[in-house]
Amino acid sequence: MSVLLPLCLIISMFTYSNAAYCLCKEGNEQVLQKAIDYACGNGADCTQIQPTGACYQPNTVKNHCDVAVNSYYQKKASSGATCDFNGAASPSTTPPSTASNCLTGSSSSGTPTTGTPTTGTPTSGTPTTGTPTTGTPTTGTPTSGTPTSGFPNTGTPNTGTNTGMPNSNGMPTSSSSSVFPGTTLGPTGSGGLGDPNAGEKLSVRTNTVVFLLTGVAAMLVI
């Protein structure tokens, strides 16, 4: 008796470890519907087989039964639940092809997929360097005007050789009143050489000087 108990535990553990899934058998749909009702009422996640659930399709009693009894079995197997449902279900190591994405195996451990982040290569734009345009300065040629030098008009002086008749003083009269031709530097006034009263004035002065000299001589004699 003491030997049979450990053996039964080992067998049960071996059976559980290999029975990854709990699936409904092909048969009477009423029996399968009862299995669905029992599983959904005792902790199975039956929202998946609702019309808006992810496992609603294919919409068959067999598919919905597989999802319901498997969900119940995965949650309750650790506490002693079996995959029987009054003969409507049995354990299986492989999931059905119709609902494989909706069934989770008890002994299957999924390998997490680590996504490799995609590092985008930054695009560096090549800066465009414009070539500066250097304008050629225009140097204007200065225009030098030729100065016009005027030649002064030098008048030729008219030198008159007019010899007039001598006047009363014995001096010839000239047609020009200037001493130097072309100029006005000649003496002007009543005391010049052309004064007609010059002889009379000179005579009076001479007589005066003679008179004075005579008086001085008389005084010296006395």
UniProtKB/Swiss-Prot annotation:
Alphabetical GO CC annotations of the entry are: mitochondrion; plasma membrane; plasmodesma; side of membrane
PTM comment text = Contains two additional disulfide bonds.
Q: Where in the cell is it found?
A: Cell membrane; Cell junction, Plasmodesma
Where does this protein have compositionally biased stretches of type Low complexity?
88-187
Q: Fetch the Gene3D superfamilies from UniProt.
A: 1.20.58.1040
Q: Kindly list the GO molecular function terms attached to this UniProt entry.
A: (1->3)-beta-D-glucan binding; polysaccharide binding
Q: How does it sit in the membrane?
A: Lipid-anchor; GPI-anchor
Query: Residue positions of GPI-anchor amidated asparagine lipidation?
Result: 197
Q: Where is this region: Disordered?
A: 88-199
The region annotated as signal peptide is 1-19
Is Transcription given among the entry's keywords?
no
- Which cysteines bridge via disulfide bonds? 22-83
Q: Keywords for this entry?
A: Cell junction, Cell membrane, Disulfide bond, Glycoprotein, GPI-anchor, Lipoprotein, Membrane, Signal
Maturation-removed propeptide residues: 198-222
Q: Name one Pfam family in it.
A: X8
Protein name per Swiss-Prot or TrEMBL: PLASMODESMATA CALLOSE-BINDING PROTEIN 4
Q: State the organism named in the record.
A: Arabidopsis thaliana (Mouse-ear cress)
Question: Gene behind this chain?
Answer: PDCB4
